[in-house]
UniProtKB/Swiss-Prot annotation:
Gene: Gpsm1
Principal cellular location given in the protein's record: cytoplasm
Domain notes: The GoLoco domains are essential for the GDI activity toward G(i/o) alpha. The GoLoco domains mediate interaction with G(i/o) alpha.
Keyword Electron transport tagged: no
Protein's name in the database: G-protein-signaling modulator 1
Sequence similarity: Belongs to the GPSM family.
Length: 673
């Protein structure tokens, strides 16, 4: 049952009203202070409960209410309830603008920008962060200016990182728009670094160095990236920040991998592993083991690689990370193949297949099936290659895997696999030399080129010439196996659809409903009206009735626009009294944003139409034991030639030597080659 609303000031005598409001103000402030204390202690859920209670009590102090909104938004942000955080930061921004609090408006704009960035609405976030920067510069707030510069760089950085993931490109090989976005991020980070150096803020300098290193890493400037990460590492050690130190070592390892210094990278990853154990972070420990296993693979030390991949597998199983567990099984299979243990490799390949099927990883499933087939053939467990478990390669290239792997098969093996695969993919055979069926020109279909080259008379004469007899349907069934894969439309079908569209276009006009009876009669009298008649009809439709209809739409839409306007009086927790109503009316009009702000807002709002597009299919979820950037899949594309030189042939069966089958290690994970 809802509690009764508190009495308003007009219903109570003067002294009673003042005492009631005094108690309510004290209660609201006490609740807010307790919520702030709990949030500082890290108990955000309890802090949110106290802040919400303070809003329920309400206050007439606009600055107090603005502070409560800001704290509530920040608390919801840390709880990852970003929609609620966005709501309260919007309330804070509206209230700050209404009462003319420029510093409050700047902080609210910055908080909005950070929340929009996490939601992936980068262009809107840039508008808000730029507003924060403008006000900070206007007020001479150097600390706020530095924070705004960092936030803008962070938004551009996040946007560029997401675009680089979508492009699936290696660091340094990015599309121009992604490079431009990352360059913008680097510029703002440089400005932030210069300002925080002037302010003497070492902690902020460390953050700037770390983000500059990450940005240059994505741009492919690996030497510059190592320079910035070394600066980040030094500041982290200065402050005793173990988490930042671990991140710096990990980033240094990634950069040295792309510089080809694998031994140096391994040392940095070992430091990462040591710090992750000190921090008691199992997920990060598994990531370090995964990176070390891949690095020792590049160093051709397969026994150590298998050791670290086994550690990764154990932690992934403890944390129920099926994605990481599957990747560990795949890596272990490759390592055991390189060590000459195909039986153990087959065990992990089957486990990889099982996990890929569970999590819906189509690429992983295809890779595992191919590995299992090749390992079974190598072990000589099957009597012939035709009896092996044939990998389902249909759609392999469409799933993003490299089709070049099939080119490594020997000629004999390729002859075994090509016939069924070609039939599945194309619906016809391409390599049976003894088959002599009728050509495509034998089919009784109208050919567009002949139609336009020979003319209609030749087309009419063609059936009587008897140069080509129609193909019997029974022959088609015998010679061309039926397939469920759709055939691409030919030029004949395109011609047919062009003609169909041309003649159907006029029929559509005949089926339209006329607005007036006179027009209906005219439509019945003439099936295909002339251009003049259509122009006259279009002029008739602009009748007074039509104008009344549009007037009705305009009036209804105007009411909907009014419903969408922001109202200060609807803010939760706000009690409007004679003391603050003047601030809400007078000061609110004086703080209208300038034209530059609205021009910038319109510019970035134009991209909101992208938010309405259908999203692409979800990618494979990232497991907690996998690094944020699975750098080894990138390494394999960069080091493709090196990897081939490092492969070890199986000392296998005669079947393998005769067929020339490649190692299962050549089958790469999704996104790798």
């Amino acid at each position: 049952m809802a509690s009764p609303a508190p009495p308003v000031a007009e219903e109570l005598p003067g002294p009673a009203s003042r005492r009631l409001y005094s108690r309510m103000e004290a209660s609201c402030l006490e609740l807010a202070l307790e919520g702030e204390r709990l949030c500082k202690a890290g108990d955000f859920k309890a802090g949110v409960a106290f802040f919400e209670a303070a809003v329920q009590v309400g206050t007439e102090d606009l600055k107090t209410l603005s502070a409560i909104y800001s704290q509530l938004g920040n608390a919801y942000f840390y709880l990852k309830e970003y929609a609620r955080a966005l709501q309260f930061h919007k309330h804070d921004l509206l209230l700050a603008r209404t009462i003319g609090d420029r510093m409050g408006e700047a902080k609210a704009s910055g908080n909005l920008g950070n929340t929009l960035k996490v939601l992936g609405r980068f262009d809107e976030a840039i508008v808000c962060c730029q507003r924060h920067l403008d006000i900070a510069q206007e007020q001479g707030d150097k600390v706020g200016e530095a924070r705004a510069l960092y936030n803008i760089g962070n938004v551009y950085h996040a946007k560029g990182k997401q675009l680089s993931w979508n492009a699936a490109q290696d660091p340094g090989h990015l599309p121009p728009d992604v490079r431009e976005t990352l360059h913008r991020a680097s510029e703002f980070y440089e400005r932030n670094l210069s300002l925080v150096k002037e302010l003497g803020d070492r902690a902020a300098q460390g953050r700037a160095y770390g983000n500059l290193g990450n940005t240059h890493y994505l741009l492919g400037n690996f030497t510059e990236a190592t320079t910035f990460h070394k600066e980040r590492l030094a500041i982290a050690k200065e402050f005793g920040d173990k988490a930042a130190e671990r991140r710096a070592y990990s980033n240094l390892g990634n950069a040295h991998i792309f510089l080809g210094r694998f031994d140096v990278a391994a040392e940095h990853y070992k430091k990462t592993l040591q710090l992750s154990r000190q921090l008691r972070d199992q997920a990060v420990e598994a990531q370090a083991c995964y990176s070390l296993g891949n690095t020792y693979t590049l160093l051709q030390d397969y026994e150590r690689a298998a050791e670290y991949h086994l550690r990764h597998l154990v932690i992934a199983q403890e944390l129920a990370d099926r994605v990481g567990e599957g990747r560990a099984c795949w890596s272990l299979g490759n390592a055991y193949v390189s060590m000459g243990s195909p039986a153990q490799a087959l065990t992990f390949a089957k486990k990889h297949l099982q996990i890929s099927q569970e999590i819906g990883d189509r690429n992983g499933e295809l890779t595992a099936r191919m590995n299992i087939a090749h390992l079974q053939l190598a072990l000589g467990r099957l009597t012939s290659p035709a009896a092996a478990e044939k990998p389902d390669l249909a759609g392999y290239e469409a799933q993003g895997a490299r089709p070049k792997r099939t080119q490594r098969l020997s000629a004999e093996t390729w002859d075994l696999l090509r016939l069924p695969l070609d039939r599945e993919q194309n619906g016809e055979t391409h390599h049976t030399g003894d088959w002599r069926g009728p050509g495509r020109d034998s089919l009784p279909l109208p050919m567009r080129s002949r139609k336009y080259q020979e003319g209609p008379d030749a087309i009419e004469r063609r059936p009587r010439e008897g140069s080509h007899s129609p193909l019997d349907s029974a022959d088609v069934r015998v010679q061309v196996p039926r397939t469920g894969i759709p055939r691409a439309p030919s030029s004949d079908e395109e011609c047919f659809f062009d003609l169909l569209s041309k003649f159907q276009s006029s029929r559509m006009d005949d089926q339209r409903c006329p607005l007036e009876e006179g027009q209906a009669g005219a439509a019945e009298a003439t099936a295909a009206p002339s251009v003049e008649d259509r122009a006259a009809q279009s002029s008739v439709t602009a009748s007074p009735q039509t104008e009344e209809f549009f007037d009705l739409i305009a009036s209804s839409q105007s009411r909907r626009l009014d419903d969408q306007r922001a109202s200060v009086g609807s803010l939760p927790g706000l009690r409007i009294t004679l003391n603050n109503v003047g601030h809400l009316r007078g000061d609110g009009d004086a703080q209208e944003p300038g034209d530059e702000f609205f021009n910038m807002l319109i510019k970035y709002q134009s991209s909101r139409i992208d938010d309405q597009r259908c999203p692409p299919p979800d990618v494979l979820p990232r497991g907690p034991t996998m690094p944020d950037e699975d750098f080894f899949s990138l390494i394999q594309r960069v080091q493709a030639k090196r990897m081939d030189e490092q492969r070890v042939d199986l000392a296998g069966s005669p079947e393998q030597e005769a067929s020339g089958l490649p190692d299962p290690q050549q089958q790469c994970p999704p996104g790798a080659s």
